[in-house]
Amino acid sequence: MSKKALLALEDGSFFFGQSLGAEGETFGELVFNTGMTGYQEVLTDPSYTGQIVVMTYPEIGIYGVNDEDVESDGIKVAGFVVYRSVDTPSNWRATMSFPDYLKKYNIVAIEGVDTRALTRKIRVKGAMKGAISTVDLDPDSLVKRVKESPSIVGRDLAGLVSPKEVIVENPEGDFSVVVLDSGVKWGILRDLKRVGAKVMRVPYSVDIDDIKKLNPDGVLISNGPGDPAALLKTIRLIKDLLKEEIPLAGICLGHQLLGLAVGGRTYKMKFGHRGINHPVKDLRTGRVLITTHNHGFAVDPKSFGLPELGSEDQDANVLTKNLQKISVLEGISPQGIKVEITHISLNDGTMEGMRLVDYPAFSVQYHPEASPGPHDAKYFFEEFKRLIKEVR
């Protein structure tokens, strides 16, 4: 018989369910992911550090877990919420059940919760602080402690998942890329190696002299958790890299950090984008890509003198029709740097990609490597390779 568990939110609401995984309690920002598959990649994605993830699909664990579909060296989410778990997987690749995987990494999770109601609450009120507990089953007590817990805003969480030393992969590659590692997904590393790169992962706290010693042909600014505005040292480093005119590419958090480095602003989204079927328009070609997303912050186009393109609260059907008409937008940062918006979300108009007109640098907010998700955007890595070859 499963032990009783309690999920409490900072707005005072609470949900009882059954314990899934380890016993104990965990605190974090409550967010939702709409993927029907890919739960193992979600669990192991370092960008979810500090977050309790609600899976909107009702059955989780059908195909178990395996030794290949991992994005880091272990589970990184703070907690997990599902409607119903499956403890007898049906897949030839499975090496362990989903509940046993949670227990292996001591992850506190809950099942039997109305995840549809929970998702609607997050959509209406926004992502909020929450906690799962098997030891404190008093709703008033747990809600009080949730309210007292730290917010994700202003927190540097990258230090929890960044490496402590340089890690070299594919040393015989045709060209070299430093990955400024704030919690890089292994799928990104796989795609860099796929296009022939020697990969050098470095701590997110290095300085320009550390980068110069490695003499890379390019630098990729990785994904990662937390508030980008809190990573002041990394932002300064990116400014220095731009002065050196080293080819730069950014993914997710890396996109936000590049935007901040040129004088832009970031903002916290109401509930964010987390799923594997988000439509994004490439404004340069008019092509629509189906992409994987995991971000709760975004770059503000208004900080480049451009209009707001939409919001999470607008009617998606009406907004999408209007956004389809937009072509490439060019703005100027407060530092006088020309910024071209290259990609936008067709769901809500969020800025999903940019290019610096006078510097060898570009970035995307979505995840081109997917893992999980469609491969529409994998050309990002070939594009980065071409940029490096042009500059080199």
UniProtKB/Swiss-Prot annotation:
Q: Which reaction does it catalyse?
A: hydrogencarbonate + L-glutamine + 2 ATP + H2O = carbamoyl phosphate + L-glutamate + 2 ADP + phosphate + 2 H(+)
Instruction: Please report which protein family the annotation says this sequence is part of.
Output: Belongs to the CarA family.
Keyword annotations from UniProtKB, A to Z: Amino-acid biosynthesis, Arginine biosynthesis, ATP-binding, Glutamine amidotransferase, Ligase, Nucleotide-binding, Pyrimidine biosynthesis
The pathway entry for this protein reads as:
Amino-acid biosynthesis; L-arginine biosynthesis; carbamoyl phosphate from bicarbonate: step 1/1; Pyrimidine metabolism; UMP biosynthesis via de novo pathway; (S)-dihydroorotate from bicarbonate: step 1/3
Write down the top EC class of this protein.
ligase
| The encoding gene | carA
Instruction: Give binding positions for L-glutamine.
Output: S47, G224, G226, L253, Q256, N294, G296, F297
Give the top-rank taxon of the lineage listed in the UniProt record for this protein.
Answer: Bacteria
Self-association and partners:
Composed of two chains; the small (or glutamine) chain promotes the hydrolysis of glutamine to ammonia, which is used by the large (or ammonia) chain to synthesize carbamoyl phosphate. Tetramer of heterodimers (alpha,beta)4.
Q: Name one GO biological process term.
A: 'de novo' UMP biosynthetic process
Q: What does this protein do?
A: Small subunit of the glutamine-dependent carbamoyl phosphate synthetase (CPSase). CPSase catalyzes the formation of carbamoyl phosphate from the ammonia moiety of glutamine, carbonate, and phosphate donated by ATP, constituting the first step of 2 biosynthetic pathways, one leading to arginine and/or urea and the other to pyrimidine nucleotides. The small subunit (glutamine amidotransferase) binds and cleaves glutamine to supply the large subunit with the substrate ammonia.
Q: Which organism is it from?
A: Thermotoga maritima (strain ATCC 43589 / DSM 3109 / JCM 10099 / NBRC 100826 / MSB8)
Name by which UniProt lists this protein: Carbamoyl phosphate synthase small chain
Source species taxonomy: Bacteria, Thermotogati, Thermotogota, Thermotogae, Thermotogales
Question: Annotated region CPSase: where?
Answer: 1-174
